[in-house]
């Protein structure tokens, strides 16, 4: 890929720091997780643009595409297994059809056996064809507030079930980011623990 680990880890720390600095306990419960994801995505895409990558919103999904147009990177919140070499990490929140199609595209290029079919048939109007040949890597991040660290890995998903990754072909464990030197990232009782490490999650309820 031609990227150094710091090109991926540093923006994530900066994004997390920015989200924490702007946090207010009066905001909706989902806003903090969304802010973390949004700030990390913004900082990451800004850094990768400097290195010749191009930011795109593919079907409204924010991605950075490599200079040769063969691969993309997506920042996604992970669970507590993130960046554990012997772990089995998953994305923290379920993902939709766009992500499922990206995983299916990865699987087509992979020789590893799979157990499910990810792609959803969106019909003739599907706009994914322009990016169908991209190999999409996931920059998985997890803020461990107990250890006061940010764990990250850059991994290639090739199977998923109901919006969650169930199989990775390759996982690159990135250096753990010690947050003890960032005083504004220290644990705060006012920061909702369940929102701290997640992407945004919406629940739709029918109202009669």
Predicted regions and their residues:
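Short linear motifs in intrinsically disordered
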Residues: 37, 50-57, 128-131
């Amino acid at each position: 890929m031609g990227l150094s680990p710091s090109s991926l880890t540093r923006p994530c720390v900066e994004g997390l720091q920015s989200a924490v600095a702007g946090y207010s306990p009066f905001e909706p419960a989902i806003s903090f997780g969304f802010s973390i994801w949004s700030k990390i995505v913004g900082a990451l895409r800004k850094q990768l643009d400097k290195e010749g990558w191009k930011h795109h919103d593919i079907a409204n999904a924010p991605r950075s595409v490599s200079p040769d147009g063969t691969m993309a990177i997506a920042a996604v919140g992970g669970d507590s297994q993130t960046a554990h070499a012997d772990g089995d990490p998953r994305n923290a929140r379920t993902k939709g059809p766009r992500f499922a199609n990206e995983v299916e595209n990865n699987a087509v290029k992979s020789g590893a056996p799979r157990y499910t079919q990810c792609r959803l048939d969106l019909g003739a109007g599907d706009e994914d064809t322009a990016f169908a040949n991209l190999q999409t890597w996931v920059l998985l991040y997890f803020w461990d507030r107990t250890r006061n660290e940010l764990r990250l890995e850059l991994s290639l998903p090739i199977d998923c079930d109901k919006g969650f990754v169930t199989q990775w072909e390759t996982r690159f464990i990135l250096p753990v980011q010690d947050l003890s030197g960032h005083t504004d990232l220290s644990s705060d009782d006012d920061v909702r623990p369940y929102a701290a490490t997640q992407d945004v999650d919406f629940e739709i309820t029918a109202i009669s």
